[in-house]
């Protein structure tokens, strides 16, 4: 590499230093914002349950398996500057829901012969799963270009979960034929969230934005073999209204 080429590279590097330093100290000048997003929550989780009940003076067993699927989410929220120019405190509410099919297998005692169980299977549709979540965030807002800001956030999440499961079985003889009604279970659990929000100003007080966020929690569902994972990776877009 020639001396002239090295000098050019060094000069370019020295010119870039002040610009980089300036970018590191750029101040976010607004007071806060209100946000609305629509997007998709990606990922699915298995839910397996087992339960027993008394029938013909013996014990019957019923097991179910279903896949809690991903779905569309909506979000309302906001944030307000709490320290310096760049740190905001935020809160948002998200809702997502989905339906699933449930595969049911049961071991049903014989009404006449003792200790001669019969295997029965069935399939149900329309098992509902929904998650309402409140996300509390510390957000670091940083202007990165003209009209373009990036917010990095993290904090705890409170999940309010509703889940349809199989908890009982109705047996009709002869056959047997079975009916497995769905029962709604409600649980509240705590998890966390972390994400990035990109905002581009189209007006002085209005921005369009995109969000990528990971949320996680786990809930104890009655009869479930393991805790059910809630949340997932969320990606969406929406609008922001800025407070000056």
How would you name each of these model-derived features?
Residues 1-30, 244:
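Cleavable N-terminal export/targeting peptides
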Residues 29, 83-85, 143-147, 201-205, ...:
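Outer-membrane beta-barrel channels and translocator barrels
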Residues 202-218:
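Short cationic/low-complexity microdomains
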Residues 27-37, 71-75, 86-90, 131-133, ...:
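Outer-membrane beta-barrel architecture
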Residues 43-70, 94-134, 159-189, 217-234:
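Extracellular/periplasm-exposed beta-strand and loop segments of Gram-negative cell-envelope proteins
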Residues 36-40, 74-80, 91, 136-140, ...:
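Residues on the lipid-exposed face of transmembrane beta-strands in outer-membrane beta-barrel proteins
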Residues 23-85, 240-244:
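Short glycine/proline- and aromatic-enriched beta-strand/turn motifs that initiate or cap beta-hairpins
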Residues 25-26, 66-82, 86-96, 126-143:
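Outer-membrane beta-barrel transmembrane strands
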